[in-house]
Amino acid sequence: EGEKHVGNVEVKAQYGKGKSVNLVVNGAAXPQEYDLDIKANAPQAENLKKLDLSLKTKNPSPDTYVVLVAIDADGRVYKSQSTVVYSEANPLIDVSYTAPNTPTSRLYVKGVKLSENQAKVEVKIVNIRDLSLDAVSEATLQKDNIILKVVANSEKLGLKNYKVDVATKDANNNGKRLEFQATNDNKNVLSGSTTFISKQENKKTIIEGSGTLKVKEEQKSANFKYIRTILTEGNEQGVETFLNLAVGESSYVAESRITNLEYKNSYVYCEEKKQCAHVELNSKVNIQKPGVVQHTVNVNFDLVKLGISPEFGLQITNEISEKKLPQYTLDLHAIKNDKKYHLNIYSHPELGKFPAGITVTLPHRVLALETRVEYPTNKGLPFPIKGEITIHPDKRKAQYKTAARFLVDVTGSDKQHALIADFGFSHPKLGKEALFKVRGNLKNSDNIIEIATSASVSCHPIFGADRESKFVLQVSPSSFKLLLDTPIVKVIELEGTAVVKENLQQGDLKFCLLQGKPVAVRALIKDYQYYEFTTDESDRKLSVIGHLDPEKRVDISADLVLSGEKKNIAHGALFLKDNLVKSEYGASKDNFDYFVTALKNDLTNLEARVKQLGEEINSDFKDILKRAQPKIQELEKAYKEDLEKIYQEVANDETLKNSQVINEVAQFLAKIIDDIVHAFKPLVDKVYNVIVETTKKIEEIYEKEIAPQIKSLYETVASIVKEFFDGLLDIVAHYAALITDFYEKHKPELEELTNTITEIFKDLTRIIVIQLKELKATVGQALEAIITTIKETQNSVVTALQAKYEELGVPESVLNAILEAHNAIRALLPTEETKNFADAVYTYVSKKLRSEKFDEQAQLRVVYEKFTVALQSLIQFLRGQFNQFGIPSLFNIESIPFITGPGQLSYTPTGVGASLSLVNQILRGDIPDPLSLIQAYRPRSLDPFDEIPAKLRGVVVNGQHIFTFDGRHLTFPGNCRYVLAHDYVDRNFTLVLQLQNGKPKSLILEDKSGTTVELKNNGQVAVNGASHGYPVEEKDVYAFRRPDGVLGIGSQYGALAYCSAKLEVCYFEINGFYLGKLRGLLGDGNNEAYDDFRLPNGKISTSESEFGNSYRLASSCPQAKCPEHSHHQQHAALPPACEQVFGGTSTLRPLSLVLDVAPFRQACIHAVAGNAENALREACSLGAGYVALGLGTLLPAVLPPACVRCTDAGGSKNIGDTYEVKLPNKQADILVVIETTKSNEKKDKDLVVPLVSQVVDTTRNLVVPWNLKSKHIAGIKVYLIGVTSRFPYPIVYDTDLKLKSAKVAFNDEHRYQYTPTIKTNCEKADSIQKTIANVIDEIRIVLGLSNINAGYLSAFETPLRPGALKHVITVNGDACKLEIGTPLQAISNIITYNQLGITHSLVASIPGLEVDGKSAPNVIGYTNDYALEFDGKKHAKEVQGAKVTLTEDNYCAELTEVTDGLVLSATNYNALGAGERKQFLLAAANAITQRILQESIVEECVCNYANPFVGRSAC
C-alpha cells in the first residue's frame, strides 16, 4: 500500500475435547509508524479467555518518539503510553500506565530552555506505588550567578507547598556566597549559605562551595559541586552535567547527559548508614567502527529506601553490522526480599558461530534452553559442523540436563578423504549418553586404496554392551585386506600379500571365518623351477611342493605336517640318473584319510559355530525386549515430574502474585503447559500401552514361533554347507584315483625312455606330443567327471533347499502374529485414510506370504494411490495438532523495529518472508513456483565452481542505456568520461566509459598500477594513450579481437567486457569476489537492487540524474539530464519497433520467462521516442544487449529476424533469402593460421611472410607469372590468426597484406598442452605420476580434446566473403598426432572446401620425405596428384603420379593430402641456400596462386544466422 507494508498471520488450534485457541497477528510498517496487534482467544480456558496485545510506535518528527502498549485480558485493560522528545530546547518524557483496579499512573518530565543559561523543568508523578509528586523548578546558571527555585507537593513524601530558593548574593569581602532557603508547609527545612567559587576550564563550567546550613532546627555542614560540560568533539554533540550535594550525613548526586547519541539521567539519594535510593535511565548509540552500530538501553530502579519494592533492572542491547548478523541481548531482573528473578534472552550470531538461548532464574531453580551451531570459516569447506540443543530444568545441576548434539566432519585431500558423524542424546535417566557414530575413510596414496567404515551405538545398558560394525577394504598392487565385523560376530578377516619379481613370485593369504581358527595359505614360485603351495593352521600344515627342471628333475610332493612331523600323502618324480631317466611316485592312503577326516572335523566345527551364532542372536534379542519396557516407562515418568515441578513453582510464587500483570501472564503460560501435558497424556498413555502390549506379543511370538524357525534355518544351512563340502572331498578323492591311474598307465612308456636316452633330442618332441594327446583325453575325462559331480552336488543342494523351504513354509501362527501387529498399528493411526493405506499394505504382504496368485502391479498401484491420500490426510492432521498448542507451521512475521531511544536505526522492509524449511512449506501448502526456482537456481556456467561466488553481470547499450549488476535500468545521455565500475576497496581495476552526445566513444580499463587499455568506437585499441594493434597483453590487463569481430578487454583481477565493433553493445562480467565492493554507473553489485544508485560518498540517491552525474571524471563537463522513469512503463504498451523485438511473437519471448525483460522494454520506450527513423535500429541494439545478458548465463537466445541482415555478399539480405554467387571474381581472402610454438618463429620469418608476399605481389622470373595482382584480383584481404596450447581460443592479429606489421609472440614449448607433475624426489612416486600424466595426455590428444583443436575450430569461424576466392594456409610447429576424429574431419573438410570453393595448403617440417621410396631433398611440396620439385637446373617442375611417403608420421600432412591440399616442406626449405630459397618461394607461390584461381563455381547461398547477433551467407 504505497510506502506502507502490511503483514498478518492467523493460527487456529484445537486441544482436548471441544477446546480451541485462536491467534491473530497483524503488522504494519511505514517510514514513521509501526503497528503490531496480537489477539489471542481461548474461550474454554479457565483463567484467561481473551488476550489482546497492541503495540504502536510513531516518529511524527525527527526528535519525537511515541510508543503505545495496550493489553486487554478478558476486558481488563492495561495501557502504557510513552512520549519522548529529544530536543535541546523542549525535551519531554511522558509515560502513563493504566490498569483496571488502580488509578492511572504517570511520569511526566518536561524541560523548557528559556535562554542560553536559563531553563525550566516540570515534573509530575501520579500514583506510582502510591507516590504522587508535582514539582516545578526554574534555574539560571551563569558563571557568577545561580538562581534555583523549586516548588513541590507530595502527600506520600510529606511535601506541602515545599519551596526551595537558591541564589548567589554579594559577600562583605567583595566575594559571593550561595544562600539556601527551603520551607515545607511554611516551616523551615533548610536555610543558610555556603561559599561560592566559579571557574571555567575550556568547555567546563565548575561551581563549588561549602558552609553551614540549618536543617530544621539543627546546624549541619554542607558542600556542593556542580560541573557543566559542553560536548562538541567527535560525532557526539550535547551537554553533560554533574551535581553532588552533601548536607550532614545525607548526600544527593544527579548526573545528566543529553547528546545526539545518548540520553542519560541518574539520581542517587543516600542517608546515614549508606542507605541509598537509586534511579537511572540510559539510552545510548555506540558506533564502534564504520558499519557497526550498537544500541543499548538501561533502566534501573532501587527505591527500597523510599518504601518502594522490588528492585528492578532492564538492559537491552542491539548490534547491527554490515558484515555480521544482528546481535541481540535482553536482561531483565527483579529482587525482593533477597529473592532474585532474572530473564536473559540472547542471540549472538557470528561468522562460524550461532549461539542463542533463554535463561529464567527463579529462587529455587534456573531454567534454560540453549542452542549452538559452529563451523570453521578458515577452510574451503564448512566442516566440522557442530550443533547442540540443551534443556536445563535446573542449570545449577548440570547432571539433570537433557541434550541432543551432532557433529559432522568431512576432510579431504588428494590422498585421503574422511567422514565423521556423531549423533548424541542424553537424559539423567539414561545415565549415559546415547551416541551413534559413523566413521568413513578413503585413502589413495602410494598405489594403495583403502576404504574403512564403521558405525557404533553407545548407549544405556538397555541394549547391552556398546555395538559396533566395521568394514575395511585395502587394496594395493602387492597387498589386499578385507574385514567385516558385526555387533554379533566378526564375519570375515582376510589379509593377503603378493611379491612379483623376476625370479620370485609369492602370494600369502591369511583368513579367519566367523571367529574360527585362522588359516594361512602360501603360493611360491622361484626361478620358475620351484613351486610351493602350503596351508598352515594352528595344529597342522598341508604342503604341496614341486620342482620343474627338465634337464635334471621334475617332481611334486604333497605332505601333511603334524606337530613338526612330516607325513607324505602323495609324491611323484621324473629325474636323470646315470644318463638314464628314472621315475618315482607313491601315495599313503592312511595319511590321505587322515587329511580328509581333519577337513570333515573342520566342517563339523563350522556347522556348530553357525548354530551357536543363531543361539546368541536369539538370546540377545530377547534380552533387549525384556529391558526396553521398564526404561520407556521410567523416561515418561521423569518428563512428567519435571513439567509438574516447573508448573507448581511458577503458579505458586508469592512474589509473582504481587504483580497483577505478571501473575496473569504467568498463570496463562502455566495453564498452557498444564493443558499440553494433560492433552498429550491420553495419546502418550495409548502409545505406551501399545508398545508394552506389542512387546509382549512379539516376545511371545518370537519364543513360540520365530525362534524355533530361526534355529531350524541355521541347522539347515549348516547341514547343507557340510553336505556340499563332503561332496567336494569326494571329488578330491576321485581326482587322486585318476592321477594314480595316470602314472600306472604310462609307466611302460616312461621305462622305454630309459632305453632310448641316446635319441632323446630327436624323439623328445614326439614323446611330448603323445603324452599331451593322452593327457588331453585324460583331462577331458576328468573335467567331465568334475562337471557331472558338481551338477549332481548342485542339484542335490538345490533340491534339499527347496524341500526345506517347502517344509518350513510360513506358519499360520506367524501370519496371525502379523495380523495382530497390523491391528495394533491400525489402532494408532489418526485418520481413516492412513488406516486404509495400512489395510492395503497388509493385504499385499499377506498374499505374498501365502503365495497366492494375483495381479501384483495392480495391487501395488492401489497401495501407491492410498499412500498419496494417506500422506495428505496425515499432513493436515499434524498441522491441526501443532496449531492447537500454539505451534505454528510457519513463522513469517515482518520484523517491527522497537523504539528504544535516540539515534533510531530505520530500515526499509523488504516484504519477503522465509519459511523455516521445505517441510514447513509443504505443511502449509506453499509449494514454490517452479519458474521462480528455475530463475533463482539455474546454472549460469558450465563450470559450477566458476560461479562461487556468483558473478556480476551488466550491459550498456548505445552508451546511454545502462543495466546494472542488480537488474536496474538507467537512461543517461552523458557527454563526458564516467566511471562504470570501480573496486573502491582494493582498487584493483576501474572501468570508464567515454560518451559524446550520449553515444559511446571509447571504453577504458585501468589496472591498479595505472596502465590503461582503451577500446575505441572505430575498432582500434590504445595502450596508455598510444595506438597499439591486437592483441594487447600487459601485466594485469589485456585486449583482444575474436574472429567474428567482437572486441574484448579484461583484467587478471576478475573484470571482463565484450563489445561490438562500434561499442553499440557492451557486456560486462565481474568476479563475485567484488560483491558489494563496487561503485559506478553499473551499481554496487550487492544483489540488492534498491541501493544501486549509490553515490561515491555512500549515500543512496533517488535521482537518476544526480546518480549519473556524480560519476563524472571532470567537473567541467555539462550535467546530463535523465528522462523520467516510472514503474508502469515496464509493462506499458510497446511502440511498433519495440513490439517487433520484445513482443509476444518475438524470438526473445521464451527468454523473458527466465530473464526479466521489463527494464529492456522500458529502455526501448525511451530509445524510440521521437526517433522514428532509427526506431528499429535502437530497439534491435537493446535486444542485442538482452541476448548478451542471456547468453552470458547459459540461456539460449537469438535476435529476431527483423534485426539481422547478411551484408557479406553485396547488398543487404534478409534471413532466409537465397541467391547465387559466381567465382572467381575480383576478390580474394587469405586466412593464415599459425601455431605459436617456438619452432615456428623462424619458419614464420623466413618462409611464411615472404611466401604470402609473393602470393599477393607480382611474381617475376617465371615463364607463366601466376599471382593475384597480376590476375587483376584487387580486393584482397589477409587474416592472420594464431592458435596456442595455452588456451582454447585463437589470437587475432592486426596485420597488413604481407604480414609484416603483425606482432606474433612465439612462446609455446609444444603443440599440445601436457599435464604437469609435482617433483617429490621419490623416484617411484615421480615415475607413477609421469605414467598417469602420459596416459591422460594421450587420451586427450586421441579424443581431440586439445586447446590447439579448439583454436582451429574457432579460427575457421572467420567471416570470409562468399564472393571472394578463399585460401587457407596453416603453419604447423610440431608433428600432429593421430586423433579419433581425423577420418571424419577429412570427410567434413572435403565437403566444406568443395562447397565453398576453398583451397588450402600446409607449411610444416617434414623430415624423412621420400618420393618413390627414395630420399627427396629437392621436393618443394606435394599433393595427392603430383610432387613439385627442382630439376637439375633448379627449375620447379611437377612430377605427376609421384608416390610421396613420410618416414615419420604427421597426420596434419596426411589430412591435407587427402583433402586435395598442398603440403610445403619447411625442412627442405631450411636446407637450401639463399638463391635456391628464392626459387622455392616463387614456385610455392605459383602453385598456391594456380590452386586459388583454378576454382570456377556457382554457389547457391542462403542468408542465415552465423551467431545469435549476426547473419552470414551459407553457401
UniProtKB/Swiss-Prot annotation:
Biological process, per Gene Ontology: lipid transport
MF terms (GO), sorted A to Z: lipid binding
Subcellular location: Secreted
Expression tissues: Hemolymph.
Glycosylation positions in this chain: 988
SS bond list: 976-1117
InterPro entries registered for this protein in UniProt: ARM-type_fold (IPR016024), VWF_type-D (IPR001846)
Annotated ranges, domain VWFD: 952-1118
GO cellular component, one term: extracellular region
Record's function text: Mediates transport for various types of lipids in hemolymph. Acts by forming lipoprotein particles that bind lipoproteins and lipids. Binds the A.niger cell wall component alpha-1,3-glucan, a fungal pathogen-associated molecular pattern (PAMP) that activates the host immune response.
Name assigned to this protein: Apolipophorin
Source organism: Galleria mellonella (Greater wax moth)
